[in-house]
Structure formats: C-alpha cells, structure tokens
Amino acid sequence: MDQVMQFVEPSRQFVKDSIRLVKRCTKPDRKEFQKIAMATAIGFAIMGFIGFFVKLIHIPINNIIVGG
C-alpha cells in the first residue's frame, strides 16, 4: 500500500497545483491583448525583412560563385 501511495501522491499534488494555477490565471484585457498582438506583428515583420534582405544579398553572391 505504501508503494501505491508513493506513486499516487505526486500525481495528486500535481493535479492540486494545476488547479490552483488555472484558478489564478486571468484572460488579458483588450489593451493587453492589442499590445501583445502588435509586438508579435512587429516581430514577424522584422523577421520577414531580415529574411528578404539576406536572400536579396545572397542571390547575386551565389550567381558570382556559381558563374551562372
């Protein structure tokens, strides 16, 4: 019985902690959501421009190396 309790007790504690976490969590309000969405959009745009410029620089260099 003691071995069973050693297995069950961590699971029970995990469930208890998880329930407490979910009860503490709150949804972001509209202002906070807009701030997060704007930061994400700016990050996507920056990464897109970086990728575009890397490709823009890489194509002529690749043509010079390959000789095409």
UniProtKB/Swiss-Prot annotation:
Task: Output the Gene Ontology cellular-component terms.
Answer: cytosol; membrane; Sec61 translocon complex; Ssh1 translocon complex
Q: What is its main location?
A: endoplasmic reticulum
Q: Which Pfam families match?
A: SecE (PF00584)
- List GO BP terms, alphabetically: post-translational protein targeting to membrane, translocation; protein targeting to ER
Q: Which residues carry this modification: N-acetylmethionine?
A: 1
Report the transmembrane regions from the record. 33-61
Membrane topology label: Single-pass membrane protein
Which InterPro entries does this entry report, sorted A to Z? Prot_translocase_SecE_dom_sf, Translocase_Sec61-g, Translocase_SecE/Sec61-g
Q: Which GO terms describe its molecular function?
A: protein transmembrane transporter activity; ribosome binding
The record's note on quaternary structure and interaction partners says: The SEC61 channel-forming translocon complex consists of channel-forming core components SEC61A1, SEC61B and SEC61G and different auxiliary components such as SEC62 and SEC63. The SEC61 channel associates with the multi-pass translocon (MPT) complex.
- Compartment list: Endoplasmic reticulum membrane
Role of this protein: Component of SEC61 channel-forming translocon complex that mediates transport of signal peptide-containing precursor polypeptides across the endoplasmic reticulum (ER). Forms a ribosome receptor and a gated pore in the ER membrane, both functions required for cotranslational translocation of nascent polypeptides.
Q: Which UniProt keywords apply?
A: Acetylation, Endoplasmic reticulum, Membrane, Phosphoprotein, Protein transport, Translocation, Transmembrane, Transmembrane helix, Transport
Domain of life, per UniProt, equals: Eukaryota
Q: Which residues lie on this side of the membrane: Cytoplasmic?
A: 1-32
Question: What protein name applies here?
Answer: Protein transport protein Sec61 subunit gamma
Q: What family name appears in the similarity comment?
A: Belongs to the SecE/SEC61-gamma family.
Q: Which residues carry this modification: Phosphoserine?
A: 18
- Gene3D superfamilies documented for this protein: Preprotein translocase SecE subunit
Q: Which gene encodes it?
A: SEC61G
Q: Which segments sit on the Extracellular face?
A: 62-68
